[in-house]
């Protein structure tokens, strides 16, 4: 990674819709050079995708919660994580230190829906203890931005 790569990252992380042509003009290099560098960063998994973020409240998902999960059998956490991936309402999953094993961010239609997901999909995976924190307001949401 050199200064040009970091400048390209800064531009595209600030605006995923910016064209390679615009990036090339700002960086004073050819569009092909920008394309090659972005492709190389994708191949090296520095860039892992581009996406649109949904406003889930606008499509009915009124509850956002953070769950701390402790499992009876921690030797199978990789298998558990694979099963958590199948729960579409879970949007983040982290293996953590401390008294819990896994931390997830989850969206649900409402509190009853959240309860159903926890009881019917998460607890059967071997959860012995949970702690749930409810978000009452998202103050900001962003991608890490260079520059």
In which residue ranges do the predicted regions lie?
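A compositional/biophysical signature of low hydrophobicity enriched in polar/charged and small residues
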Residues: 1-147
